[in-house]
């Protein structure tokens, strides 16, 4: 069985992603390792905002959504400028953020805030990864980022969920949209 982080990484690889940009932090180390195992190269940046623009560059070169990774709190806040830019410039991006476990969020207050409340207001969509729906959430995120008017989609991944093994059943995948020829 694969962990949630491994499933996310595998689905991103299947979507054509080969690079992820960001800054390491305790809450995203499991995700970083899974990205590497799946075949995505992690590129260390000096600021999350610059990582976002690098992710945009990979979209323009490859046609696959860019991938930006940020750790809890300030790491997420540092990326807001780029997320707004990606929404305005129609850049498909998967923005993966690490967070503390929900039970800890009530007592562990160092650099903790509601990522979905901040990013959800400026992105096409924001999801919190939950057990049993990892495949569905990542597939939906990639689809939303690429379909219609492209843009950034946020997925918040707690440390507990990232390392937890997920069921082997493969859910039905969404059919990729096909271009329609004019009549």
Where are these regions (language model features)?
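N-terminal alpha/beta PP-like core and its mobile active-site loop of ThDP/TPP-dependent enzymes
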Residues: 1-183
